[in-house]
Amino acid sequence: MMSETNLESLEDFIDTQVLEAWRGPKKVPVEEFFTSGHRTCQGCESAQLMKLMAKAGGPRTIILGSTGCMYVANTTYYSTPWAIPWMHTQLGSSGSAATGTAAALRVMMRKGKMAKEPINVIAVCGDGGGADMGLSAISAALQHTQYNLLILMYDNESYANTDIQVSGSSPWGANSTFSPPGKVRRIMNRRWKKNTAAMLAAGHPDCKYVATVNTAYPVDVMNKVRKALSIGGPTFIHSLDPCPKGWDYDPMFAHELGELAVETGIWPLYEVENGKFKMYGKSQRILSGQFKRKPVREYLGRQGRFAHFTEEDTNYFQSKIDAMWEEWLIPGVIPFTNA
């Protein structure tokens, strides 16, 4: 077993870098590290997320991609879009792969086989590989505080790569391959969406940074990625990504749906940094009363997966969102109420 002294002697090899926030799009460099050559669907916001993430990390970044949409669509033979090192890992092992890669880099630097320099380790996974099958590996990774890494979950609210099966992130009532509305039972998926980011933030007090993002707000995405890579230790970011195939919408509305998810209060934008909670953008304005939440029907009505909703279903969905902001201990985030 390694002694505390030896553990402390390795601290020099946990290099972090200072990635300053970009103040507006004009400050963002033009160089791209996720380029043409991918095979994502038109209107896929997860592809936009990969582009923003890679740009935020820069050239000294290693990407680990678990099985999912962003693996299959980005690894067509001889046409990868990645201009930085990338490795495939199994569906539920993004956390394990990130920890192992960060540990290997540390050993190589300690043995003098690599120059001591900050190298970003980012593991990406979908909601199936993150909120479901890979949750235990992510939890374990967030407890290894000696390693610098970021786990980024792109959440399109289904197993979209294998034809839109229900995941733990699928919203209540949504039509999917495994939850089609029927004549006897109209609502087949009766579970509310898993609150992954808040769950990981609350359950891992040593994790310095957990955040939510949405590609409709690209500068916010990049700055949160840069903060996660700079703070030191394992971090987690949860992105809500509209999916034209699974959500059944015209690709031209992808960006607008991302905005509506925030403006209706369905998807709060926040971060937990060193245990301190902070809302961002319109979510902060909703919390302070400066912005009135839009009705959820504006969001639901743009998507074919909710086309079977009756007025009763829409009102129920609205009541759940109202409760998130009006009754929860931390509005929109922590689903506890005072006794």
Question: Where do the model's predicted regions map?
Answer:
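Arginine residue identity/basic-tract feature
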Residues: R23, R39, R60, R106, ...
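Cofactor-binding active-site loop characterized by glycine-rich and histidine/acidic residues
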Residues: E4-Y154, S158-A160, I164-A174, N189-R190, ...
